[in-house]
């Protein structure tokens, strides 16, 4: 008998034990996602990127992604642009894998974070705002209610998501001692800049 999957991730999960919260955790980086049906905390650090914490509050299944839209020189996101199609692909990956773990499509709830104006030297004005606008528009289009949001501002955020309860804790990082956050997002942005769109990903049913 095949055991049901307990989690899905884009890459090998970066696992660690969080001493403060006294629990197992997975840290995701720009371009990654993680979905689980276990009591695993999901953690990420956001600058201009956005993260969606998606979960089924009854079945206690959830996941988080971390992405931004590639630069296609469009001021506002539009679902037909190449960059928006990349965002759609990032969202559909997360939704599909939460559903594969057993979550119900019509029970999903979302909490969204990030979109800060923290990157320097970008040709697109306020990329964080574009990312935030895209993710809110997408969730509205998919009829997934946004239960909580902490978007925009000028500070990076560290996000802690507890999928079994839907609880999210956010810490604004107002003092930055190095350029790690900006370097990771800049490298990720350059990596996806010339990628073809993700293509069509069929969503599972209710």
Curated annotation (Swiss-Prot):
Molecular functions per Gene Ontology: protein-glutamine glutaminase activity
Catalysed reactions, semicolon-separated: L-glutaminyl-[protein] + H2O = L-glutamyl-[protein] + NH4(+)
Top-rank lineage group of the source organism: Bacteria
Keyword hit for Cell inner membrane: no
Enzyme class: hydrolase
An individual GO BP term: chemotaxis
EC numbers for this chain: 3.5.1.44
InterPro entries on file: CheD-like_sf, Chemorcpt_Glu_NH3ase_CheD, Cytotoxic_necrot_fac-like_cat
Role description: Probably deamidates glutamine residues to glutamate on methyl-accepting chemotaxis receptors (MCPs), playing an important role in chemotaxis.
Full protein name: Probable chemoreceptor glutamine deamidase CheD 1
Organism: Shewanella oneidensis (strain ATCC 700550 / JCM 31522 / CIP 106686 / LMG 19005 / NCIMB 14063 / MR-1)
Gene name per UniProt: cheD1
């Amino acid at each position: 008998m095949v055991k049901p999957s307990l989690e899905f991730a884009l890459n090998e999960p970066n696992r660690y034990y969080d001493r403060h919260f006294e629990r197992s955790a997975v840290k995701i980086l720009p371009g990654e996602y993680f979905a689980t049906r276990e009591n695993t905390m999901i953690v990420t650090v956001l600058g201009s990127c956005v993260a969606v914490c998606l979960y089924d509050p009854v079945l206690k299944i959830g996941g988080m992604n971390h992405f931004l839209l590639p630069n296609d020189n469009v001021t506002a996101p539009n679902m037909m642009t190449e960059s928006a199609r990349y965002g759609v692909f990032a969202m559909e990956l997360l939704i599909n894998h939460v559903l594969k773990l057993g979550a119900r499509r019509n029970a999903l709830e979302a909490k969204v974070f990030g979109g800060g104006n923290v990157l320097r030297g970008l040709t697109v004005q306020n990329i964080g705002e574009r990312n935030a606008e895209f993710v809110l528009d997408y969730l509205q289009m998919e009829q997934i209610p946004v239960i909580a949001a902490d978007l925009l501002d000028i500070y990076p955020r560290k996000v802690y998501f507890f999928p079994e309860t839907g609880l999210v804790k956010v810490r604004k990082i107002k003092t930055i001692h190095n350029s790690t956050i900006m370097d990771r997002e800049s490298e990720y942005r350059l990596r996806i800049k010339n990628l073809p769109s993700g293509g069509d990903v069929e969503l599972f049913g209710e």
